[in-house]
Amino acid sequence: MGAVSLAGKTLLERYRVVRPLGQGALATVYLAFDPFGAPYALKVFPKGAEARRDREFWVGKRLDHPNLNPVLEKLDLEEGPALLLAYAPGEEMGRWMAREPGRARALKVFRQLLLALAHMHEKGLVHRDVKPENILVAGTDEARLVDFDLSGPALEAFKKPLRVGTLPYLAPEQVLGQSPGPEADVYAAGVILYWILAGEHPFVGAPEEVLLGHLKEPVPPLPGLGERERSYLERLLAKRPEDRFRSAGEALEVFPF
């Protein structure tokens, strides 16, 4: 599906598509307006992907938190199955960080990430793809976690080993193709916190080197951290799930920054 294939069209005689907001491997997201001028994000999946659409709808309708982007409705279009999402103004966290907002503001966004994940974990759900590209930051520094493509019940058993997620943020158990629980989201959040503090990921290099880093290499120490901050970061990034915080809510309770 081309990224501009729906631009300029009116769908279901209601939603006027203006432009694509982003395109991933699984779907294309467009900016659309209803007849009253209200903006929405319209996520269109390839034809035949109803099951994937329905799964994301199932996850989204169980969530209700200001730091999670609402899933409003599922639509059946001629172009393919779709989801109507709330429009989240702002930009991806990576672009936002490139403008050097400062550590204090970045940590404020990180805390909102923990709040969003804590809500998911309380509902028995795991995001599975926590990364800056899935965190939208508005001009007021309000953040929303988006994209529940890979989300689902905690420790959901897959029919076959499946590595889900994005390489720099994969927990060791995800590298091994194991079913991830909330601790996998905690690990990914730890990678983001390390990136905020250091300006780079803890493990860099060729894909094989990054995978090995997640599995076996110690986290490179960061100078200037106090004992509480250092211990907190190490626990987020522990190799074994049982050595991490059990959920984002638990990590939030002792957030030292």
Where are the regions a protein language model picked out?
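Conserved C-terminal C-lobe helix
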Residues: 225-238
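Activation segment signature within eukaryotic-like protein kinase domains
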Residues: 109-110
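AlphaC helix of the eukaryotic protein kinase fold
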Residues: 49-62
